């Protein structure tokens, strides 16, 4: 007979396991609605909240034999119940999902998880979400993407009226029951500086010296992380790097994955996704162009890419770099994509042969002092997505440049699957199925698996839309995985962007193999972008080989004939 004033319901986990969902799925919605009706019968003014399910970790013993899929079906059923009954839907899944260590038995949250759930309920009841908050990308000197509807989103207390204004544009909205709010402003033309103002009745945020221009995310592993001051052209280019309209957001790791054992405080921070240093947008001013400062420590490839865009487009350019040395592709893919499309790579990842041996060994050394069986590491599948992509909160960007693959070159077949998942994962995150994605083909390090990997990267040009590949092997080093000649590579990425994204009359690439045919005992190779083809040094062509059906290759003499190689 007790009629509660507030009711919070979290039901459905036990419908996934024990395994009664196949037998009782048809009763779930009906029974849930009857439960809600019973509380309303006891108190007609009751406030009812129902929760999306807490996660189930992929290490659950029956994850792939129904539990994963039934969990997803029940989530949808709960959302339908909320819509049908008009009760408030709260989310226990989202705040726990990036922290699988909290699910000690793969199902039940520990005390830390219970605290997060309690916070979620408290905020839902009170509407207190900590007031107006923005993504860490919102700082003075930021660059906003031009010429597209500009979405600005954040958190505020439930029901708070939020006003966003920039230039002559202003939009107002109200924060939802979950504290989230979003406005979409009319497109901004390239220019500035502007002041971006975001306010509620209690809080007034202002961001000064804001520009509208082209924003690109620059990501990958160590060759993207490789700093301008380390490049072979640094001495000449750093003194000339000052540019008020080139802005840099440099996300650097708090701890490098060197050959060391990390201490307990580091390990705990990693578990809570506190891996990147706090940073802010920096301007390429003369002071910042000095050695050992913002531009000198920024990614060389990203800098040369951005500089070529600046010179060619004559608009502001903002570069966000979150590259992490040694990181494998799988670390950058969202958890749901791997759970549903490549779950094998998640299982016992530190002992998993899909993960490169060096990656596993370095991670094992770094976390050696941890007693937590679910200890996290930057190289773990999903980790860098959850710590380095998710916090960007869909900040509007034009596209992505990517240099990675060294930590996946041992298994090009798996990488092909992972790379496609990566591109789709990020496009889904930014809600842009055509998000440009331009990547670097691995260099000419003398490792047996790398030619096969490079060929796989080349073939993916024809398998994924809106991508481009910059060749780097002619500027590589057979003995050094980190060649210092970065300027041509960054500019080659820029040529893809200028041609494909900005429709400029620029040839995007050197010759790219299209096909072969045999005539008179000779092989004729055809190429895209092959007009005017010649050797880079003016000497006879080198490094060509041919094979019979047995697959054994032999050196071959090659020459350019028109737009073909014979």
Question: What is the predicted function of each stretch?
Answer:
Residues 154-156, 160-168, 523-525, 531-553:
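Beta-strand-rich binding/interaction modules
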Residues 136, 144-152, 488, 495, ...:
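Surface beta-strand/loop "capping" patches
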Residues 1-33, 57-59, 69-72, 187-190, ...:
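Conserved SGNH/GDSL esterase-like catalytic core that processes O-acyl groups on lipids
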Residues 153-236, 312-314, 563-566:
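Extended acidic/polar, glycine-enriched regions
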Residues 2-129, 308, 381-473, 477-514:
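Alpha-helical cap/lid subdomain in secreted, periplasmic
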Residues 222-295:
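Secondary-structure boundary elements
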Residues 104-106, 176-178, 550:
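Acidic/polar residues in short coil/turn loops that connect beta-strands
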